[in-house]
């Protein structure tokens, strides 16, 4: 149920500022009765809305209680080669490879050119 389904006649300010006309014997009873009828209708409307919202709240809480628990997806682990120290770049690897080749093959590489 939405609040559009309920019709409100008075605001708190209107109730506070309401002045009744007085007749010879006090307030005009018809004015007082009309005003009190509107107050009663509003209280009835508020009561209905409160009951509807409480019922909806109970329903939603039960829905939550019965819903399966979902966890946030875990990020996929990133692969990092164990042989590479942190911060090693391709340039560093190529430089190390070049030094290794020079050490293993020595001058043989220069002779083939």
From Swiss-Prot:
Main subcellular location of this protein, as a coarse class: cytoplasm
Residues forming coiled coils: 36-68
Pfam families hit by this protein: DivIVA (PF05103)
Cellular component per GO, a single term: cytoplasm
Location in or out of the cell: Cytoplasm
Single GO biological process annotation from the record: cell division
Presence of the UniProt keyword Translocase in the record: no
Keywords, in A-Z order: Cell cycle, Cell division, Cell shape, Coiled coil, Cytoplasm
Family: Belongs to the GpsB family.
Function: Divisome component that associates with the complex late in its assembly, after the Z-ring is formed, and is dependent on DivIC and PBP2B for its recruitment to the divisome. Together with EzrA, is a key component of the system that regulates PBP1 localization during cell cycle progression. Its main role could be the removal of PBP1 from the cell pole after pole maturation is completed. Also contributes to the recruitment of PBP1 to the division complex. Not essential for septum formation.
Self-association state and partner proteins as the record states: Forms polymers through the coiled coil domains. Interacts with PBP1, MreC and EzrA.
Identification of the protein by name: Cell cycle protein GpsB
Lineage, top ranks: Bacteria, Bacillati, Bacillota, Bacilli, Bacillales
Gene: gpsB
